[in-house]
Amino acid sequence: MKKYLALALIAPLLISCSTTKKGDTYNEAWVKDTNGFDILMGQFAHNIENIWGFKEVVIAGPKDYVKYTDQYQTRSHINFDDGTITIETIAGTEPAAHLRRAIIKTLLMGDDPSSVDLYSDVDDITISKEPFLYGQVVDNTGQPIRWEGRASNFADYLLKNRLKSRSNGMRIIYSVTINMVPNHLDKRAHKYLGMVRQASRKYGVDESLILAIMQTESSFNPYAVSRSDALGLMQVVQHTAGKDVFRSQGKSGTPSRSFLFDPASNIDTGTAYLAMLNNVYLGGIDNPTSRRYAVITAYNGGAGSVLRVFSNDKIQAANIINTMTPGDVYQTLTTRHPSAESRRYLYKVNTAQKSYRRR
């Protein structure tokens, strides 16, 4: 297991200085950092495959919390999009005991991402008096789970009634799946409404847009990470959007990982970046609806890439946009932007924002 320990030791060093996404300027150091992070993730995935088997690699992402323990033999996976929690183990001895511990800890974990290393098997999950999943999961009696006694009883129920096993030809995988409550997304969103309202007032950005960005980026997962090392609820990258915001606020350097994993700081930084896109980078677009479409797309792929859809000259691009209807701007960005991800992103955020405006 030495190579896995080595991976865990170097992970914080590589992750802390890697970046991509949400910006148009990348210097050579950032490219090297991104390549280093890609290498790390590739090695991490390869190691998981060696332990779990082919097609069994599951790694944390923007909308997926994945934590390995027990020398990588047990994992907890929360899919925030699907609303499912899957606890699995390949432990050869007492698999039920491994599952039971993981179930209890997952149900009772707090909401401090900076205290948990998702790229190692260190059991650093602490039981919280205010569990992150409280209200998003109910036990077999229909009650929310706050205390260890109720979590333990629910774990015993699950192991007795919902334990499954399967073979991948290499290992026997034991698992338990828990469905979250139907409105789990709203439950998570509600946790951050106060922070969203504060950032909205501070920067003059519509609450519905902030919430739509959060839903699209992370599904309100405070543990959100990505292969491009975007962090937290609004998936802010330290060296691009984070650095731009710090510079605009008269701060030197870049926001730390712990800063961006703090929900209030992440929402503040992400909203500040939206304001910069709206007021500075894309401020030459007159129609507020057209500008909103451009801002949304730029949050994903950068302001420069948005303007280049219309012209390589930024001023001319804004002038062209100003001759178009908002509907034509939307149609152009969702069909002609070079990034398929950015094209879909505008559709997703715009759709989500409509739902928040109706509330």
From Swiss-Prot:
Recorded name of the encoding gene: mltC
Annotated PANTHER family: MEMBRANE-BOUND LYTIC MUREIN TRANSGLYCOSYLASE C, SOLUBLE LYTIC MUREIN TRANSGLYCOSYLASE-RELATED
Membrane topology, record value: Lipid-anchor
Places the protein is found: Cell outer membrane
Lipidation (S-diacylglycerol cysteine): 17
Record-linked InterPro entries: Lysozyme-like_dom_sf (IPR023346), Murein_transglycosylaseC (IPR023664), Murein_transglycosylaseC_N (IPR024570), Transglyc_AS (IPR000189), Transglycosylase_SLT_dom_1 (IPR008258)
Superkingdom field: Bacteria
Keywords for the protein's UniProt record, in alphabetical order: Cell outer membrane, Cell wall biogenesis/degradation, Lipoprotein, Lyase, Membrane, Palmitate, Signal
One cellular component term from this protein's GO annotations in UniProt: cell outer membrane
A Pfam family that the UniProt record links to this protein: SLT
Signal sequence interval, chain numbering: 1-16
GO biological process, one term: peptidoglycan metabolic process
Biological role: Murein-degrading enzyme. May play a role in recycling of muropeptides during cell elongation and/or cell division.
Primary location group: membrane
Lipid attachment site numbers (N-palmitoyl cysteine): 17
MF terms (GO), sorted A to Z: hydrolase activity, acting on glycosyl bonds; peptidoglycan lytic transglycosylase activity
Reaction equations catalysed: Exolytic cleavage of the (1->4)-beta-glycosidic linkage between N-acetylmuramic acid (MurNAc) and N-acetylglucosamine (GlcNAc) residues in peptidoglycan, from either the reducing or the non-reducing ends of the peptidoglycan chains, with concomitant formation of a 1,6-anhydrobond in the MurNAc residue
Matching NCBIfam families: PRK11671.1
Protein's name according to its UniProt entry: Membrane-bound lytic murein transglycosylase C
E.C. code: 4.2.2.n1
Family: Belongs to the transglycosylase Slt family.
